[in-house]
Each structure stands twice: as structure tokens, then as C-alpha cells.
């Protein structure tokens, strides 16, 4: 991958990618061409978002960075807000909030794929959940977009996402967004009025 496509995998990711390639090689009973190796890599780590995608993502300064992420899951689009230390952390927190999951951002690496003003960047994101690593890769001229795509692929691999046919109740997500957007003056009474709940 490095020699033919300038892809320099993080050390911690190499064994898993090698295993995926070896599995195909063993099944086909032959050595794979560089292009075939790249296609296996792309299928497993770049174009692999079977459960959810992100339609859009916007950021603003708010006690760090706030991400407004539009998540497309099960054919439904939901906007989720969350804060983080940086853009990737903020987007990661929208996923944790929406799906009700927990994981750690364990590895982040990036490098240019080619030289020049219009060169693409590649980002590698590794997350850890229950002691196991999950990897995703993104490529884009915008390194932030590449990073977010890599995170989306990694989170799609979590077993909890596959099992989670319906995400948390949309009404709960709406309440969390309302509280976050009005955190300075939110009260139980205002939440009750906004969401037609019985008075506390």
C-alpha cells in the first residue's frame, strides 16, 4: 500500500489489514496484485458505512467546540449537538449521545497522499471499545472531512451499532439538544412547556 499508493498505515493497524488481505489471498489460493490489496483496504476501511452516514456537520465555538451533526440512521435524519475539545471529539460525542454508546478515541494519524496545492490528505482513526480496536480511514482535500469520515467508518464497525436497529428515542434527543442550547436558563418548567410534559 505504501509503495504503490502512498498509504502509510499506523503501526497498530497493520496487523489487522494484513489479516484481511491474507484471508482473501487464502480463499483465492493466489498472491494478490497491489490493486487488489488496495480494493480490499478500501472496501473494509474507507467505503464501509453500512448502518449510518453523516449528511452534514457544522461547528461553532461554545465552551470548546460544538458540533451540529446530521445523522442518517435507518432512513431517518436527526440533528444532534454536542461539545468537545476539538472538532473530531465534538462529532464523536454526537455519536455517543445519539446511539447511547461509549468508546475511546485511541489513535489518530494523518498524512498527505500527494504533493501540491490540491493534494488529498488521508486520516486514520482507531477507536477502542471493550478492549477491542476498530479502524476507519478517510481521504479528502479537507483534512477535517477526512478525519470525520474515518471516525464514521470506525463507529459503524461497533457491534452496538449493528444491534441498534432504532436509535434512542428522537424525543429524548430533541430534549437533550434543547437543554444544551438553553443551558443558561433552562428549567424543568420550560422543558415541560416545550415538550408538552406534565408540570414537575
Question: Can you annotate each of these PLM segments?
Answer:
Residues 2-162:
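Terminal or standalone catalytic/regulatory effector modules within metabolic enzymes
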Residues 167-175:
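N-terminal positioning helix adjacent to the helix-turn-helix/winged-helix DNA-binding module
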Residues 175-187:
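Basic, amphipathic alpha-helical hairpins
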Residues 185, 189-200:
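Basic/polar phosphate-binding segments, predominantly the helix-turn-helix DNA-binding elements
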Amino acid at each position: 500500500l505504501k509503495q504503490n499508493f502512498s498509504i502509510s498505515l499506523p503501526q497498530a493497524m497493520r496487523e489487522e489489514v494484513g489479516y484481511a488481505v491474507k484471508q482473501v489471498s487464502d480463499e483465492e489460493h493466489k498472491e494478490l496484485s497491489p490493486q487488489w490489496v488496495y480494493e480490499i483496504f478500501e472496501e473494509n476501511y474507507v467505503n464501509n458505512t453500512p448502518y449510518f452516514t453523516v449528511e452534514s456537520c457544522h461547528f461553532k465555538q461554545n465552551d470548546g467546540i460544538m458540533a451540529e451533526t446530521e445523522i442518517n440512521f435507518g432512513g431517518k435524519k436527526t440533528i444532534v449537538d454536542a461539545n468537545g475539545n476539538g472538532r473530531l471529539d465534538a462529532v464523536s460525542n454526537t455519536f455517543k449521545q445519539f446511539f447511547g454508546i461509549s468508546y475511546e478515541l485511541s489513535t489518530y494519524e494523518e498524512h498527505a497522499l500527494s504533493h501540491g496545492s490540491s493534494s488529498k490528505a488521508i486520516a486514520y482513526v482507531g477507536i477502542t471499545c471493550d478492549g477491542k480496536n476498530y479502524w476507519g480511514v478517510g481521504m479528502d482535500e479537507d483534512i477535517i472531512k477526512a478525519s470525520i469520515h474515518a471516525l464514521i467508518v470506525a463507529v459503524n464497525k461497533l457491534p452496538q451499532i449493528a444491534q441498534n436497529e432504532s436509535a434512542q428515542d428522537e424525543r429524548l434527543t430533541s430534549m437533550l439538544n434543547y437543554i444544551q442550547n438553553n443551558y443558561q436558563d433552562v428549567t424543568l418548567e420550560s422543558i415541560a412547556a416545550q415538550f408538552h410534559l406534565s408540570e414537575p
